[in-house]
Amino acid sequence: MDITGDSQYQCWNLTEKDAEKVRELLSHAQKYEAIEMRDAIAAGLTGWWYGAYLMSEEKFMAVAYITQSFVYLFGRDKTAMRCIGRNLGRNSPKRSGTASHSIFGPDALVKAFWDGFEVAGKDVKSDTLLNLCELTEILCKQNDAYAVRVAEKKDFALVFEFLGEALIDELGMDVRRLGREGHEKYCSEQIANGRILVGTHRGKPAFVGEFRETPQGIFLEHAHFPIAMRRPKVMRGIHARVAELLLGRAPTLLFYVDAANEDLKAAVDEVGYHVVMPGRLMRLR
């Protein structure tokens, strides 16, 4: 157990005995806050969780959920989150080879975490405002030039390439070369599970994306367009077809959009997406 410089908090790696108090903290999240964390804890406090405990009130004020490539943040107090960042930064390796982590959560909490975490050898690769957008109704007309369907075995090569490109920023490496066997297995499993979509523009490959179902709706993830297809008109046409397919499975479609990507914002706005939760994504190297 680490006791921070601020004596009102204690920080430690969480175990199952802490689960109920973590759930109590997460119960204060708004509808679209801490979705990944709430989904993860539904089956128990597995994986790596780290928390800041306010001793005077006997409750957690901030928690971090750490996966292979992400650090998800939620809390009710910036000081508590700064303490988490300080302790994790103190114990973090100065260099981590080719691997990278992405810190994600509400803007103020990511800032507080980084204020505590920042250590020599940890650099910010990118710092992005990432908006969670919701779609419940398609507002634009469909165009027959675009088509989207669930990927099949015959699409493996396309999925392998496009999904590999989509994962470069998240993982900090090109899994098509540095983790080829694992990436092949992942693509095959996701295709078999019916969780990959492929899209075309006039018959030419234009899009690959993944989706997963959550209590809040269907999440569209790792949505990738090759450079030649990153035009607002094309992205609008593909996203409209994606929505047509997925809204047949659930009433709500969710998608994270880079607030600085004007072309993508314009495309999804026309389809009918609107911002429901702003967030911040900081990628480290």
What are these regions (language model features)?
Residues F60, T67-Y146, F255, G279-R285:
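Acyl-donor-binding surface of acyltransferase catalytic domains
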Residues S7-Q10, L14, Q30, M37-S96, ...:
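Conserved donor-binding loop and adjoining core beta-sheet/short helix segment
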Residues P106, V159, L220:
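Residue-level signal for inorganic ion chemistry
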Residues I196-G199, P205-F219, M235-R236, L245-R285:
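Contiguous, function-dense segments enriched for cysteine-driven chemistry
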Residues M1-I35, I138-R176:
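Short amphipathic alpha-helix that is part of the acyltransferase structural core
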